[in-house]
């Protein structure tokens, strides 16, 4: 039995890595052929992209649909199937490496280059300053979440904390059985998606929590919406989808154990709220590109990419790498070395991708 589980875990992990590399190739191959100049550029001498080109807008709309459908499917999937813990644990670390590499090598580089073109006589590091601002803004959203949880903690029953055990994937129960008291006590301190929604004592608290939790997802979507080429849009899509889908799966697993009444409706409702945030950001980015052009569009792009850098770094470090998916029962593949390898692989994928992006 143990050997069979190990084989299945190994198969899932190999499939995950193959899918990641295939998606990378697809992101660049589908990003635009050499003859699709009407979508990626306006044909001017400077080679400036046409942000209102029909092909570019269509690609962004496809990205909107894919990230919404993928996140929603991931959120409700635990209701229909059982996910492998090793796949989720290492896959989340892989997504963290991808997020970190994308922020540092793609978004920050693009923002810095655009600011250099906009302000050639200024040496001030605007891109890096905005990255810090994005990091702090995301931390502020997390502080708002912590405030709501702390305010509602005194009004919730002690038993409510026993169901909370996810920190981007940390489970406090297995196969429907309650966890041990120490695990439940530790889970009470978690500020995770599922546990915080579970402890929200009023509808207003729940709405505020969902808004705060989806704050960075909206800016992630804006990174797709303001992309200058189809290749950039598809690349941002698969980067964001990795994080969103893994987080949605982990949230769905915890909700099934914490909310036994009408579990499918609970999973669908929370997954829908989590899934719709990034498409909202994509829509905002599309509207920005549709109403601006030239120098104004460059400023918006530079500021958006700078803020997105800080948000991606915060999500990578504080939500994916430091917390990740931690199953209650030990998993053979979930070791420090395994997690390091997954993170290095995620960063390496972006490093290789950037060879064709420079």
UniProtKB/Swiss-Prot annotation:
InterPro entries: ZIP. Glycans are attached at residue 112. Residues 28-60, 108-127, 228-235, 289-296, 357-358 are extracellular. Residues 82-86, 149-206, 257-267, 318-335 are cytoplasmic. GO terms for biological process: zinc ion transmembrane transport. It is a multi-pass membrane protein. Residues 164-185 are annotated as: Disordered. The keyword Signal applies. GO terms for molecular function: zinc ion transmembrane transporter activity. The keyword Membrane applies. GO terms for cellular component: membrane; plasma membrane. Zinc transporter that may be involved in zinc uptake from the rhizosphere. Belongs to the ZIP transporter (TC 2.A.5) family. This is Zinc transporter 2. The gene is ZIP2.
